[in-house]
A protein has these predicted regions:
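Intrinsically disordered, low-complexity acidic/polar segments
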Residues: 30, 109-110, 211, 225-227
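A long amphipathic alpha-helix within ATP-dependent nucleotide-binding catalytic cores
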Residues: 168-200
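Active-site loop/lid in soluble adenylation, ligation, and acyl-transfer enzymes
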Residues: 1-145, 258-287
Length: 287
């Protein structure tokens, strides 16, 4: 059985009236697939997504059917698919990456220093790096193909972009994307903080089901799609340590002559961070 689509870090298989999404142990940074594999990374992403999908059903339904390979075709009942595979409903995915920022960091901080704005949104003066924002902000982007970069767009541009694909529904869909993104972030960020983790920012993706209703797709609040910081020791004014692939990003930035290969020590520390965030948030250990 071959995947119908292979993303940077995921393979998607057609299962008739459903899809099976396999989160691989590949790692990508700056939209480039690195040469390393990070053992258990795919399992963390799948199981953490399941955790959040279960928690947020009161806000919006999601595409998850099962993460148990026993519910999947025989092909997936192999050890390499156990734990990192999710059977999902088929959706018509919306062409927007829904980014929400609760703290100012990364590209948002760089933009704010230059212009006082992030993705066209004016922020208060005098913010320091890693400061909590007065309210979370929604900063959508377009979806890039492999090898390209996502492009930040304004809310108004997101309406026009959606209108091209869904004539007559651009404004309605853009508003639903924004409102659901903020609602999901607020609920999950509050929970995570109670477990000792700050969700600085994250990305959601949504699709429409067969009745045209909005559904959460892709993965949700994983170390691949989010910036997780330890709440203990949080101090604005500089970058924060993190539980996500920022560790790998930082090494690549500090070593520009790399050939997109991380030292084993960085790989080991990266998976340690992934596992630690999973255990803190869910209260469970991965087998």
């Amino acid at each position: 059985m071959k995947p119908i689509k292979e993303g940077k870090v995921r393979e998607i298989y057609d299962n008739g009236d459903s899809l099976i999404m396999v989160a691989t142990d590949r790692i990508s940074c700056f939209d480039v697939i690195l040469n390393n594999q990070v053992t258990k990374k795919g399992t963390v992403r799948t199981q953490m997504s399941k955790f959040w999908f279960d928690m947020t059903q009161d806000i919006l339904p999601n595409h998850m059917i099962s993460v148990d390979v026993k519910d999947m075709p025989e092909f997936f009942q192999q050890e390499k698919f156990d734990g990192n595979s999710m059977m999902c409903r088929k959706l018509e995915m919306l062409p927007i990456e829904c980014i929400v920022r609760g703290y100012i960091t990364g590209s948002g901080w760089a933009s704010y220093k230059e212009t006082g704005k992030v993705c066209g949104i004016t922020l208060p003066e005098g913010l320091k790096e890693s400061d909590k924002l007065p309210e979370p902000i929604y900063t959508p982007s377009t979806k890039a193909e492999i090898g390209d970069h996502d492009e930040n767009i304004s809310y108004e541009q997101s309406i026009a972009h959606l209108e091209k694909y869904f004539p007559g529904r651009g404004e309605e869909l853009a508003a639903k994307l924004r409102d659901n993104t903020i609602a999901l972030y607020k609920k999950c960020a509050e929970y995570a903080l109670s477990k000792g983790i700050i969700i600085a920012d994250t990305k959601f993706e949504f699709g429409l089901d067969e009745n045209g209703n909005m559904v959460i797709g892709d993965e949700m609040l994983t170390p691949d799609s989010s910036r997780f910081w330890p709440a203990e020791g949080y101090e604005p004014g500089h970058g924060q340590p993190s539980f996500d692939k920022q560790f790998a990003r930082d090494w690549l930035k500090a070593n520009p002559d790399n050939d997109w290969t991380l030292p084993q020590e960085i790989v080991d520390k990266t998976i340690e961070k992934y596992l630690q965030s999973y255990e803190m948030l869910t209260g469970k250990k991965l087998d």
